[in-house]
Amino acid sequence: MSRRRHIFISHHHADDAHVSRLTQMLGRNSYEIRNSSIRAKPANQRRIDEGRISDQTLKRLLRMKMAWASTVVVLVGKNTHNRPWVDWEINKANQLGKRIVGVFERGGTDNDVPDAFKDYGDALVSWNSNNIIDAIEGRCDPFENPDGTPRQPDSNFPHTNCGGR
């Protein structure tokens, strides 16, 4: 039986392929993701890059899409930490009281974790479907290195590991 969750996937637009891989991987585990994040088509991305869509318009759209989601998943990959929109989305998720789960993309490193996630993240997991599902569901709040080994959270908030992981 498939489980369906409404989430917002915060990511750098260059990582759109990882968004598809994440939803496909979880789908193979009967976990259906309804992603409300923005995935800019080339024409829309060009309008954004040219400044034809204001930051206020983007923020309003992101707030509406994020409000619909129960959890915000942050894809942590190369250069994620340099993306101001990812930090904005994490801060907004915190203001909205959303659960914030970081997922290391394959090849992601500790240096790629955004500063806002270090302050507000609830869980940080490797690219492993069971760990990702447990973190989204809130069954546990693990903090893992990119290779899946345990690590200390960056914040002082209390966190619980999953079943001894």
Model-derived regions: residue spans:
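Short hydrophobic segments within beta-strands
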Residues: 10-12, 75, 103
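Inter-motif core of Ras-like GTPase G domains
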Residues: 69-74
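Conserved TIR/SEFIR loop-to-helix hotspot centered on a Trp-containing motif
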Residues: 78-95
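Conserved N-terminal substructure of TIR/SEFIR domains
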Residues: 1-68, 153-165
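C-terminal interaction surface of TIR/SEFIR-family domains
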Residues: 2-7, 21, 52-56, 107-165
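Short, structured coil segments at secondary-structure junctions
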Residues: 29, 96, 118-121
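Conserved beta-strand termini and adjacent loop/short-helix elements that scaffold enzyme active sites
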Residues: 34-38, 103, 127
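A short helix->loop->beta-strand "cap" motif at the edges of active sites that frequently abuts
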Residues: 96-103
